[in-house]
Amino acid sequence: MKKITTLVSLCLSILCNAQNASVEKSVLGIQTGFLGIWAHNESRLSNKIALRSEIGFDAGYQSGFFYPEDVFFLAPVFTLEPRFYYNLNKRNSKSKVITNNSGNFISIKTSYTPDWLVIANVKDISIISEISFIPSFGIRRNIGTHFNYEAGFGFGYKYIFAKAAGYSKNESEAIGNIHLRIGYVF
């Protein structure tokens, strides 16, 4: 009887450890960082891929000849970002926490910043709408059960809709992205 009990226990423990790690079905949260505040939702597309949708405010600062004073502003931003979490199985096999998609990821961050509802310390300020595509690398780790932090970087392309603001032609440029955020998951 002892041999059967030991054998059944061993088989059950092997089956429990053989499960593949997967991203969460849905992760809803808020984050803040040095340059803004955002609300996000990550929805599972496959075991390793999640689609992050985000709405928030990016912060900015402008000064110079065209501005009578230094301008600090918050502009709305809408982001779609497919994320590939590539090390969930490795983290799971080492008994590290993978809840709320805690792991390393690569992504393509696609953001649109319109000239709507710009909040600033100067009246009647407007920004030029833009869209950006930034391949990125990042990590997310949990701090307790509901808090997390994220860090990442990437380089990509930004297209500026300058003609809509009265300029003679639209512009495009290379852009870098570095982010460090702390957040709360519901």
Locations of regions flagged by a protein language model:
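Residues that define the transmembrane beta-barrel architecture of outer-membrane proteins
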Residues: 22-28, 33-35, 72-78, 127-133, ...
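Transmembrane beta-strands of outer-membrane beta-barrel pores
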Residues: 32-36, 55-61, 84-86, 110-116, ...
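Flexible, solvent-exposed loop segments that connect beta-strands
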Residues: 61-72, 112-127, 160-172
